[in-house]
Amino acid sequence: MSKNADLEAIPAAEEIKKPNPPKEEASIKGFTWWRRTLQYNTGLGLSEDEKLNYENDYKYILERKQCKQCYEYKDWILKYSPTVTFMIQQIAKLSDGNPNIDGKNLKPFDESKIICDICPEWKSGGFHPDLGILICQNRIRNKWHLEDTLAHELVHQFDNLKWKVNWLNLKQHACSEIRASSLSGECRFGQEFARRGFGFKIANGHQECVKRRAILSVMGNPNCKDRAEAELVVNEVWDSCFNDTRPFEEIYR
């Protein structure tokens, strides 16, 4: 499984407990919710049970809002992103039941295999060959972050269909991570500058970003002993995998 890492060093996974639905829907709407918020913020007449119920309901509202926003972003990106729509077309050509290589009369891409959910890990998305693509709704910063994340995971899906990747094989995993970070757009100048500011190197900055993110992802592989092994494996496959831009003719973003 792919882990789309965003940080220099990956923090430990959070312990996330999903909130329970509110006892009454009316309690999180209108005047009642405003009153509860005011009471929580001031502490006036607030019992411990009321405090815990408010915190649960606040988290419930936040997660529901994140989920709605994530699916809205996803639907927009699937419709309007040139990178994502191109990847979907290429994946459709490789999918079972789609032997028509000229791209005509293809079965539609199964968008239900792209889901939004809460992720305890500090990653923005993931790919599983049997389950599909996960978008981490609590880690997505904006629509364009979701576009990069989805493009990254679609490269993994393409690789898995074309080459039957063994995700526990470190070299195969590393190769797909290199390609996904390079082709998705997540290492383009604007994104790296936003993340790293003036620490971003204009010369070879794209390559350094791709290598850094690939190493972090390979470190999450259960067969990887440590960072040193991840770096070794990424370096071993670097030249061939970085220069392989399929299904694009070149690095598009």
From Swiss-Prot:
Keywords from the named record: Hydrolase, Membrane, Metal-binding, Metalloprotease, Mitochondrion, Mitochondrion inner membrane, Protease
Region (Disordered): 1-23
E.C. numbers: 3.4.24.-
Xref: InterPro entries: Peptidase_M76_ATP23
Record Pfam families: Peptidase_M76
Main location class: mitochondrion
Domain of life from the UniProt record: Eukaryota
Active site: 153
GO terms under biological process: mitochondrial protein processing; mitochondrial proton-transporting ATP synthase complex assembly
Name under which the protein is recorded: Mitochondrial inner membrane protease ATP23
Species whose genome carries this gene: Vanderwaltozyma polyspora (strain ATCC 22028 / DSM 70294 / BCRC 21397 / CBS 2163 / NBRC 10782 / NRRL Y-8283 / UCD 57-17) (Kluyveromyces polysporus)
